Amino acid sequence: MTHAAASRNLSFIDKLVGEVDKALRALSPDTKPHSRPSPKAECGELSDAEKRLSASLMRVNHTGEVCAQALYQGQALTAKLPEIRQEMNNAADEEQDHLAWCEERVKALGSHTSFLNPVWYTLSFSIGAAAGLISDKVSLGFVAATEDQVCKHLQEHLARLPQQDAASRVIVEQMLIDEAKHAQTALAAGGYNFPKPVKMGMTVMSKVMTETSFHI
């Protein structure tokens, strides 16, 4: 094996080790570095039923962020242009904030994150890596379409969260701002605008994720 080939192999192995480390951080409790503190708001008194509802919705949001984190990491691994790779890594860093915020809130409500997160992480990482292998344009388009789905879920959750649960609502509101920005950035960078049938298929997959993580 030539020195150049060995260097390429080492570089790829280094990347894989890095991705495994990121996956473990995303899926392990209390190991998520985040640059921004969780948005704070005074929470009113919640009944047991309201706590269960809020916890379930925030668990769904947490799983959504696990999927987003995996999607971005998969795309960063296979992105062809350095600037696209950096864009994916930057977005993944911001998703780390969301992950930590949601996990903290779920625990504060006396519940747990989804037991199926490893499954969703693996699936999302694979989809992201595959999209990156096709082209950066498709990869960016997938980001935009995914973030559109996330924004719809967040808007629905704002409508369902108890009004007095200001602590959860302020987190979701900030996440909504960030996710909308990710979608706009991806399209502005040249992302492919997926046709409606593709988006409908993504909606079906998204509903499976939200329904399972709401309960499990």
From Swiss-Prot:
Cofactor binding summary note: Binds 2 iron ions per subunit.
GO cellular component: plasma membrane
Binding site residues for Fe cation 1: 65, 95, 98, 179
Principal localisation: membrane
Record's catalysed reaction(s): a 5-methoxy-2-methyl-3-(all-trans-polyprenyl)benzene-1,4-diol + AH2 + O2 = a 3-demethylubiquinol + A + H2O
InterPro entries for this protein: COQ7_proteobact (IPR047809), Ferritin-like (IPR012347), Ferritin-like_SF (IPR009078), Ubq_synth_Coq7 (IPR011566)
GO terms assigned for molecular function: 3-demethoxyubiquinol 3-hydroxylase activity; metal ion binding
Ligand binding (Fe cation 2): 95, 147, 179, 182
Disulfide bonds: none
Protein's GO biological process: ubiquinone biosynthetic process
Listed Pfam families: COQ7
Transmembrane segments: none
Entry keywords, A to Z: Cell membrane, Iron, Membrane, Metal-binding, Monooxygenase, Oxidoreductase, Ubiquinone biosynthesis
Pathway info: Cofactor biosynthesis; ubiquinone biosynthesis
Function field: Catalyzes the hydroxylation of 2-nonaprenyl-3-methyl-6-methoxy-1,4-benzoquinol during ubiquinone biosynthesis.
Family per similarity comment: Belongs to the COQ7 family.
PANTHER family found in the cross-reference section: 5-DEMETHOXYUBIQUINONE HYDROXYLASE, MITOCHONDRIAL, COENZYME Q10 BIOSYNTHESIS PROTEIN 7
Protein name per the record: 3-demethoxyubiquinol 3-hydroxylase
Species name: Saccharophagus degradans (strain 2-40 / ATCC 43961 / DSM 17024)
Gene: coq7
